[in-house]
């Protein structure tokens, strides 16, 4: 997994400004950080496609967009790596912001499913804005691997340290 910046109060404000307020300058910072993270990963790995972590349906409705997919777009275009969206929420999950490691794991256990008709082959990389405990990325990778999709890593804009 590669990330561009450590999660800090400033990074938190930028992520929230992008996610919740559609602040264009914040969007640019997040998508640039994801692009930089992918560039670092590409030095060591061949990547066939990017898979953004999907937002909860309620969050997508509220924001009016699929945030991570949109933030991954510039990296996809720059490196000519297609975005694929086979991950779906198979059940309702709570907002993770107030949960500890065990709470996040319990919240996400079995939460993702894969659209079986996608037929993806090759090396996939997950994309998210922030990794705090790794629970989201672990659960997404589990669902994808169960569906036969090879996940070789993940890129995020920010990394919380220590992982909570």
Kindly give the residue locations of the regions a language model identified.
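A phosphate-binding catalytic loop at a beta-strand-loop-alpha-helix junction
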Residues: 126-140
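PRPP-dependent phosphoribosyltransferase catalytic core
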Residues: 138-164
């Amino acid at each position: 997994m590669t990330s561009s910046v450590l999660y800090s109060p400033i990074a938190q404000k930028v992520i929230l400004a992008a996610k919740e307020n559609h602040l264009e300058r914040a969007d640019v910072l997040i998508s640039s950080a994801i692009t930089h993270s992918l560039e670092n990963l590409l030095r060591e790995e061949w990547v066939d496609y990017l898979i953004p972590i999907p937002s909860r349906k309620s969050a997508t409705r509220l924001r009016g967009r699929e945030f991570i997919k949109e933030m991954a777009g510039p990296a996809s275009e720059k490196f000519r790596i297609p975005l694929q969206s086979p991950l779906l929420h198979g059940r309702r999950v709570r907002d993770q912001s107030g949960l500890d490691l065990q709470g996040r794991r319990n919240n996400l256990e079995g939460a993702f499913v894969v659209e079986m008709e996608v037929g993806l082959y090759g090396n996939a990389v997950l994309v998210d804005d922030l990794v705090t405990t790794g629970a989201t990325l672990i659960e997404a990778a589990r669902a994808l691997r169960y569906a036969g999709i090879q996940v070789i890593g993940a890129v995020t804009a920010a990394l919380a340290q220590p992982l909570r």
